[in-house]
Every structure is written in structure tokens, then in C-alpha cells.
């Protein structure tokens, strides 16, 4: 009887765990769909969605970007080596360690994607006197980047299909998603424009320059 009762409790707990996980999963995709349709729409409540959604979107973007970049480099080097073997092009004496390259791109993109909201948060705190809770604000901020995540997913699928033949298309989609991140950053400066001590255009320029310095510094350090 004790064993049967214990087994029934485990089954019940497992069902509750699955139901809870499914509910969280469903809420995330509800958030994702709403932000895709209306990226800048205000929430009905300030903390309507989980404070972890922003981090989840950054992780998704980081992993997909690292994969796309590493796989493109791997495919292009392989294609060059193939042409070098059948032509007078010089052969490569060595090839990169792609696992280590992927890890470095993970670090690079993690800081890159977190840099945009962090710089925006700092500027809004200092110049616009906004007192946000960072984790919840990050969810709202990254919600405006859902379309960029979709474009990045498209680039990832294209990379799976044919990174060489679809190279130009992949680059176009990939850089389009980066442009959307820049648009989101600029938009975040204008949302509190009436409370700013500095014109939001100049705030945006300051923030983008800071982000550019961070990006170039990371590239020099990691690569």
C-alpha cells in the first residue's frame, strides 16, 4: 500500500510538473506572439510577463548567431580549400578550431546582445531619471526585438540548408536583424523623451557609440 501510494504521488507530481512547464511554455509563446504583432505596445500591467523572458530571448539570439557565424566561416573555408585543391590557389596550412571559435562567438554575442539594453538602461537611468527594475525592463525591451529573433531564426534555417549557395541571402537577413536591434535601441530612447535632459537623438548616438566601442573591443580581445 505504501509503495502504491508513493507511486501515485510521483505520478501526480510529474503531471503537475508537466502542466506547470507547459503553462510557462505557453505563456512565453503568447508573449512572443503579442510582441511580434505589436512590438512597442504597452503592457496592461507593469510586470505582466516573467522577468526571465528577456534573458531567454538573449540566449536564443546568442546561440543562433554563434551557430550562423561559425558555420558560415567553416563552410567558406571548406569551399576555398576545395577550389585550392583543383586550382592554383594557395592551400591553407591550418584551419581554425571550430569548437573554440563557437565558444568565443557565444561570449561575443552574449555581451553584444546584452550590451544594447544595458547601455539603454544606463542612459535612461542617468539622463531620463527612469527607475526601472532591470530584469522586468529587459523583458519589455527584448520584446521589441522579437521580429529580429524571427529573422535570425530564418538565417539559421538558411544556414542549415546551404550556407554557401544562400550566403548572400543569409548575410542580408542577418544584418537586417542587427538593424532591428539598432532601431529598438533608438526607440527606447524616445519612449521617455519628454523627461530627458538631453535630446533623445543625441542620447541614441551616445549609446550607439558606446555599443560600437564595446563591440570593437570584444572583437580585438576574442579574435
Locate each region found by the language model:
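Membrane-helix interface motif
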Residues: 68-85, 222-223
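N-terminal juxtamembrane cytosolic/stromal segments of multi-pass membrane proteins
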Residues: 1-63
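Hydrophobic alpha-helical transmembrane segments and adjacent short intramembrane/lumenal linkers
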Residues: 127-210
Amino acid at each position: 500500500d505504501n509503495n502504491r501510494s508513493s507511486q501515485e504521488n510521483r505520478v501526480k507530481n510529474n503531471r503537475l510538473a508537466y502542466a506547470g512547464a507547459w503553462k510557462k511554455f505557453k505563456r512565453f509563446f503568447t508573449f512572443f506572439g503579442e510582441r511580434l504583432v505589436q512590438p512597442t505596445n504597452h503592457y496592461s500591467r507593469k510586470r505582466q510577463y516573467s522577468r526571465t523572458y528577456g534573458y531567454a530571448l538573449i540566449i536564443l539570439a546568442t546561440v543562433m548567431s554563434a551557430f550562423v557565424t561559425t558555420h558560415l566561416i567553416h563552410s567558406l573555408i571548406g569551399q576555398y580549400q576545395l577550389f585550392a585543391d583543383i586550382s592554383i590557389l594557395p592551400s591553407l596550412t591550418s584551419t581554425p578550431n571550430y569548437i573554440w571559435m563557437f565558444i568565443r562567438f557565444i561570449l561575443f554575442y552574449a555581451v553584444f546582445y546584452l550590451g544594447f539594453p544595458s547601455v539603454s538602461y544606463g542612459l535612461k537611468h542617468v539622463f531620463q531619471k527612469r527607475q526601472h527594475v532591470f530584469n522586468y525592463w529587459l523583458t519589455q525591451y527584448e520584446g521589441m526585438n522579437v521580429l529580429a529573433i524571427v529573422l535570425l531564426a530564418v538565417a539559421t534555417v538558411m544556414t542549415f540548408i546551404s550556407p554557401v549557395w544562400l550566403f548572400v541571402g543569409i548575410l542580408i537577413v542577418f544584418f537586417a536583424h542587427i538593424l532591428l536591434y539598432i532601431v529598438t535601441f533608438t526607440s527606447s530612447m524616445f519612449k521617455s523623451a519628454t523627461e530627458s535632459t538631453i535630446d533623445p537623438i543625441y542620447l541614441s548616438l551616445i549609446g550607439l557609440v558606446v555599443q560600437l566601442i564595446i563591440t570593437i573591443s570584444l572583437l580585438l580581445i576574442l579574435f
